[in-house]
Amino acid sequence: DRALGRRGVLVAELTYREAVSRAIAQEMERDPSVYFIGEDVAAAGGVFKTTEGLLERFGPSRVRDTPISEQAIIGAVMGAAMNGLRPVAELMFSDFFAGCWDLIANQIAKTRYMTNGQVSCPLVIKSGNGGSVRFGAQHSQSVENWAMSVPGIKVVSPATIDDARGMLQHALADPDPVLMFEHALLYNVE
């Protein structure tokens, strides 16, 4: 179960899903201010299983299930980020950004500018993105273009396993908000 990586070094074969999961766990291990919230991310391990095992490893204070309210999830991580934590929020599907877009585009993205750099929102919002996974019309869009023109937001959409791990780690180190769109058809790719 090992193969040569791009740099000729033996590496464990991972799926895209496992790379995302490991990156989250590594950053939570490295930085105690990183925590994870979203619908079904704790006990169920997330709709795409990218948070499987995190609850057992880090406990309920750092891996939390939320009600089905994207506005509540995003409002909570905004407040936490403004107060020194490094939250990661998962919105199950990127279509659901519509329900909390005001908070993302008009509040989170502009906090650094509205406070003259005194306050920032260092957070990550990650989401399954794209169609063809048979979850229905309201679970199939690719909405990263919504965020591309919003000043103050960084947008990443990892295409490879290395991208998924590296971009998530860099996003968690970034002083500004990062939206991470993970194409749903990539989760099982090795």
What are these regions (language model features)?
Residues 183-190:
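Aromatic-enriched
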Residues 5-181:
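Thiamine diphosphate
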